[in-house]
A protein has these predicted regions:
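A short, N-terminal "cap"/entry segment at the start of jelly-roll beta-barrel domains
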Residues: 1-36, 71
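Conserved short histidine dyad/triad with adjacent acidic residue
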Residues: 25, 39-55
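A cytosolic small-molecule/anion-sensing beta-strand core signal
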Residues: 35, 64-65, 80-81, 99
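Glycine- and acidic-residue-biased ligand/ion/polar-headgroup-sensing regions
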Residues: 57-69
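Ligand-binding loop in jelly-roll beta-barrel domains
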Residues: 89-110
């Protein structure tokens, strides 16, 4: 895994093209992993999602393609391509794909 991550360093990356949709699935690819945080791209097929959970750190989601339904502490937010949403630490949140979408997840541990 470390070699694959190193291959991406010091290069221009088209994040949307780093990952492909897969029918009926959620696909992820970690592009940076450090003790201080991670960058991961995801592709969600329609009808897929991440169930409600909490995280010990803020989770920032940037939509690369499509649109996501992000629920945070019971409030539903529609997040579209080019937009981001910060899911606060300790608050229950989930993601759902009404249509396909791709996202970048930025986790900073602090």
């Amino acid at each position: 895994m470390e070699n694959k991550i190193n291959e991406l360093k010091a290069k221009n990356l088209d994040l949307e093209k780093l990952i492909n949709y897969q029918d009926g699935s959620v696909v992820s690819r970690e592009i940076l992993k450090l003790p201080t945080g991670t960058l991961t791209v995801f592709a969600f097929d329609a009808g897929q999602g991440l169930s409600e959970h909490t995280a010990p750190f803020d989770a920032t989601v940037y939509i690369l393609d499509g649109e996501a339904e992000a629920q945070i502490s019971g409030q539903v937010n529609l997040v579209k391509k080019g937009e981001l949403i910060i899911m606060p630490a300790g608050q229950p949140h989930s993601l759902k794909a009404q249509k396909r979408f791709k996202m970048l997840l930025i986790m900073i541990r602090s």
